[in-house]
Amino acid sequence: VIGGEGIGCVIYPASHYGRDALVGIALFLSSLAQKGCKVSELRATFPDYCISKNRIDLTPEIDVDKVLEAVKEKYAGERINDRDGVKIDFADGWVHLRKSNTEPIIRVYSEAATMEEADALAKKVIDVVWAVVG
């Protein structure tokens, strides 16, 4: 199991449970050594995806957990993962909604084959959030 954040931090429980960018570098270099290839060769084995990063600014009185539950209900026909917020898997990409623990905001990450598709997926779900909030 490995975890990571967009700011470059990696959490690798086999090493320790803290955020550590150097662990990510060590894992990457280890992978290069095991595969015996160059960075460009390793990169070529991965598909291209675009990620859109957005946020929804709310007010403190809004119950973000209830909003996320409503989004889950709206997309009940899609594959949903709610281990860390709400991640909705669509046929052409995904959207992950994650509440902040320090601010009244929801972070919205989406991924698709093109930036336009990633932005469109994010907008579709953001519009649902605003419809729920009213």
Go through the PLM ranges and name each one:
Residues 1-134:
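Phosphate-binding and adjacent anionic-ligand microenvironments
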